[in-house]
Regions:
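The conserved acidic donor/metal-binding loop of glycosyltransferases
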Residues: 30-34
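Acidic donor-binding loop at a coil-to-helix junction in glycosyltransferase catalytic cores
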Residues: 110-125
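Short, flexible, basic/aromatic active-site loop/helix in glycosyltransferases
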Residues: 69-100
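Glycine-rich, basic loop-to-helix element that forms the pyrophosphate-binding segment
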Residues: 5-21
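Catalytic beta-strand/loop signature of glycosyltransferases that borders the donor
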Residues: 107, 131-143, 157
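Conserved donor NDP-sugar-binding/catalytic core segment of glycosyltransferases
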Residues: 38-71
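Catalytic core of nucleotide-sugar-dependent glycosyltransferases
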Residues: 151-168
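Short aromatic/hydrophobic "clamp" motif used to bind/position activated sugar donors
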Residues: 26
Length: 168
């Protein structure tokens, strides 16, 4: 489904989408990320073959580069409280929900809010707290521009730092 919103706030708008979603597997792509041809098929098959898992996460890289947004783990691993920061990025995870398990993002976190980042970390930590199990696959890639080295965008850096600080 495509829903257009005039209101700012990444988490606020993701929540709007979650509330009208009619599927069970939910992903959170950006408009500038790119899935590989088989990404969605792999996600669906993972959930079908591993019913105890409810979160699938993978790596992000800038296309044609050996780096991506932030530092990510290089080994396949279960998601744990202590490794969410290096195994989950906003665009790299999918959740297999049942309606009664629906969880919303904190609208105070993420782009467009005062605390301009950290929404995905907070979200996955909440899911783990609810008993969800997740798996990280470093060899599965979602491409996304890394936006590295833009040291002149102090406002963006400040907003992201506030979000990170709110999480830690």
């Amino acid at each position: 489904k495509y829903i257009r919103s005039e209101e700012l706030g990444l988490s606020f708008n993701r929540n709007k989408g979650l509330l009208v979603a009619d599927g069970e597997i939910i992903g959170f792509p950006d408009d500038d990320c790119e899935y590989q041809d088989e990404t969605l098929e792999k996600v669906v098959n993972f959930f079908l073959e591993n019913e105890e898992y409810k979160i699938f996460s993978c790596r992000t890289l800038e296309k044609g580069k050996d780096y991506g947004t932030g530092i990510m783990a290089v080994e396949e691993t279960d998601l744990k409280y202590k490794n969410v920061e290096e195994t989950v990025k906003s665009i790299t995870f999918f959740v297999n929900f049942q309606l009664e398990d629906l969880t919303l993002f904190d609208p105070n976190l993420g782009v467009g809010s005062h605390f301009g980042s950290g929404e995905e970390t907070d979200y996955v930590l909440n899911l783990l707290h609810k008993g969800f199990k997740g798996k990280y696959f470093p060899n599965e890639i979602i491409y996304h521009p890394a936006k590295k080295g833009n040291y002149e965008d102090v406002e963006r850096a400040y907003s992201y730092a506030l979000g990170y600080g709110a999480i830690v």
